[in-house]
């Protein structure tokens, strides 16, 4: 089946200035935007130190699918998309997947991010803020793009994070003015360390601290340490589950499986995105799934965790699956959704059909449907 592609008549000029910073980008990772007193303190670097590198559009940035060959459209893209199509949709041989994944470091989005790394190993001269150009969020994007484990630039960035953090009995924080550990940041740094192969004994200590912070409902919450909250946060819980899963699948020495199972039960009890008391949607934003998700929870990110963990297809997740199906367009793609406000090094996709949304939705639906048929 042949596909037709339509190009925009005029390419959008490359950005030479940072994207506008929205205050919501600095909100604490909780169930709702945090008040100003609960926002992460910025690092020493200021917004004026962030410089965006102008990047010209590439042909696949401008293409629009008008036929039904979605698979070919997905493959006509960046290596970060292609290797994940090979791995998750095609189930291609490992050597095919690995060969394509290696290209993330030398072509496209991955190469662009690596090119703007500072000589000292940071990004934007800062560890956690500004969002989303700091070292933490640049490394998170490289993780989602699939930069291979052991890449020297990622290891240098991880070293800066782990050496620059403040430690509190295993938990850590990157903010200079908050003298308490932060669960989301601890989880993100564990995820990055295990994703890129950063070897540090403090990783095990951080994992043990995360295990100790699990709440009786199975979730985690950044505000437990600060405010004594005893109800899990969707945002904190998904970040912690992703970290524990990566720790377990990369040979971590601590037993985390039971804690992860209880964390997934937390989401099942909430039908993934609803109040366990009223059944109402906790936040309408949970039903949208921009890429990258940053520290935010959404239904696709939640289901991606269940997929990668090959967890049970709990019937209480069916509601969220239906929401994703309903978002599919008539051309069998899913549209680009507005990203979380903040600064970006460059735009990943233009408005219209989104390869990231389509890839992520398709592999979640395939996982669900395969399990139901079995």
What is the meaning of each model-derived region?
Residues 22-31, 38, 43, 47:
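Asp/Glu-rich intrinsically disordered low-complexity tracts
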């Amino acid at each position: 089946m042949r596909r037709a592609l339509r190009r925009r008549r005029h390419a959008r000029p490359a950005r030479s200035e940072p994207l506008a910073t929205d205050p919501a980008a600095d909100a604490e990772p909780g169930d709702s935007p945090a008040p100003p007193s609960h926002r992460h303190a910025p690092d020493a670097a200021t917004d004026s130190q962030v410089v965006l590198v102008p990047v010209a559009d590439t042909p696949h940035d401008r293409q629009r699918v008008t036929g039904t060959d979605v698979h070919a459209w997905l493959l006509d893209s960046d290596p970060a998309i292609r290797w994940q199509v090979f791995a998750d949709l095609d189930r291609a041989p490992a050597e095919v997947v690995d060969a394509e994944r290696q290209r993330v470091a030398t072509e496209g989005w991955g190469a662009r991010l690596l090119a703007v790394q500072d000589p000292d190993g940071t990004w934007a001269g800062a560890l956690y803020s500004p969002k989303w150009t700091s070292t933490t969020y640049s490394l998170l994007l490289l993780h989602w793009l699939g930069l291979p484990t052991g890449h020297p630039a990622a290891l240098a960035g991880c070293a800066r994070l782990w050496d620059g953090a403040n430690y509190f009995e295993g938990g850590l924080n990157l903010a200079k003015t908050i003298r308490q550990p932060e669960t989301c940041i601890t989880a993100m740094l564990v995820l990055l360390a295990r994703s890129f192969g950063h070897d540090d004994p403090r990783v095990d200590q951080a994992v043990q601290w995360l295990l100790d912070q699990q709440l009786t409902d199975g979730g985690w919450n950044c505000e437990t340490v600060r405010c004594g909250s005893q109800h899990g946060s969707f945002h904190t819980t998904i970040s912690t589950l992703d970290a524990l899963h990566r720790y377990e699948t990369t040979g971590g020495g601590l037993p985390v499986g039971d804690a992860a199972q209880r964390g997934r039960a937390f989401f099942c009890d909430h039908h993934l995105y609803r109040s366990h008391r009223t059944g109402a949607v906790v936040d309408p934003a949970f039903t949208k799934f921009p890429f990258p998700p940053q520290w935010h929870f959404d239904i696709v990110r939640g289901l991606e965790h269940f997929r990668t963990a090959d967890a049970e297809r709990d019937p209480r997740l069916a509601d969220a699956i239906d929401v994703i199906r309903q978002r599919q367009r008539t051309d069998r793609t899913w549209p680009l959704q507005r990203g979380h406000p903040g600064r970006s090094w460059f735009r990943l996709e233009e408005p219209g059909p989104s390869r990231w949304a389509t890839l992520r939705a398709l592999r979640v639906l395939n996982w669900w449907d395969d399990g139901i048929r079995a």
